[in-house]
Regions:
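Flexible, compositionally biased loop and terminal segments
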Residues: 1-150
Length: 150
């Protein structure tokens, strides 16, 4: 019989639902570096980060959080290679389309902050559409910050 137990996952801490914060903000940073450290393309890190954010957003909605803000793409991010920027824009499009398909059920409201004008026109239109569809919903408000900074 081994002396040490196999490494076990620590149990998730209990959530005190009587003392939840009203607002949580997340800065999407380090996903490309995370991928590079694992020998993966930076775009794989962005995809993993987007999926992790979706998991977090779902949890926040489920526990009744009022506001969730994600700083997703800053003005500095335009300096990245065009392929990487394109991949990030593609991920944003993918997740917004998925969000739209679930909005009525989830009652999530989405707002967008930052200068959206440099984004591809299709993405600008999708942001406006998402905002319009969700404007009357009363669930968690997800604020997406795009092309912010200065």
């Amino acid at each position: 019989m081994p002396f040490f137990k196999a490494k076990e996952q620590a149990p998730a801490p209990a959530v005190d639902f009587d003392h939840l914060p009203r607002h949580i903000a997340i800065i999407m940073d380090g996903n490309g570096r995370w991928a590079q450290k694992r020998g993966l393309p930076r775009t794989a890190g962005h995809a993993a980060g987007a999926e992790n954010f979706r998991t977090i957003a779902t949890y926040c909605k489920d526990i009744g959080l009022e506001y969730l803000t994600v700083y997703a793409f800053s003005t500095e991010n335009w300096k990245r290679p065009a392929e990487e920027v394109g991949a990030i824009m593609g991920l944003l499009k993918k997740y917004l389309l998925e969000a739209i398909s679930r909005m009525e059920r989830d009652r999530v409201k989405m707002e967008f902050f930052g200068d959206l004008s440099p984004l591809p026109q299709e993405l600008q239109d999708l942001c406006r559409r998402t905002r319009e569809i969700s404007k009357g919903y009363d669930g968690c408000q997800v604020n997406v910050c795009l092309n912010y900074g200065g």
